[in-house]
């Protein structure tokens, strides 16, 4: 434990996702040893992000405008919507340069343990986006964990009542992974998603 404001800084940094006590302490001491100008700039950027960044009115992605750059891009295919849990998932998929459709960010996943149900997510907005018939395929790209699977199952059942093709991203063995370390579910999915090579 440190005295006063130093401990407060460590505690606040430790509240960030993925930052444990040791990382929080390292970051705090880095800040203490950094030039005042750089620390001030960091504080300004943090405040500016909170002021200027919002969520796209259409898809829920982060944006500095009412609609995000992806939803505004006329080169994107409006017949394809990829449903993800969080905006950071959009970034991950965009890095692949494989998907040229639009996105829909749910803002989380169904998690009864955490008290998150379908009404707490942007599912109603997704259904509204599908109403005009432009969308031909919805690709469900939720995380391959219990919450992501529950969300994918809920969405697939809900969307089968609409005139839209519903698909789920394949999951299976990671490139460079060893079979002996794969769990049964991952191996099972790898077999289900296998494709012909010759």
UniProtKB/Swiss-Prot annotation:
Domain Toprim residues, every copy: 79-174
Record key words, sorted: DNA damage, DNA recombination, DNA repair, Metal-binding, Zinc, Zinc-finger
Protein name (database record): Recombination protein RecR
InterPro entries associated with the record: DNA_Rcmb_RecR, Hlx-hairpin-Hlx_DNA-bd_motif, Rcmb_RecR, Rcmb_RecR_Znf, TOPRIM_dom, TOPRIM_RecR
Source organism of this protein record: Leifsonia xyli subsp. xyli (strain CTCB07)
Pfam families per the UniProt record, alphabetical: RecR_C, RecR_HhH, RecR_ZnF, Toprim_4
SUPFAM superfamilies per record: Recombination protein RecR (SSF111304)
A GO MF label: DNA binding
Keyword Chloroplast in record: no
Encoding gene (name): recR
Function (record text): May play a role in DNA repair. It seems to be involved in an RecBC-independent recombinational process of DNA repair. It may act with RecF and RecO.
Taxonomic superkingdom: Bacteria
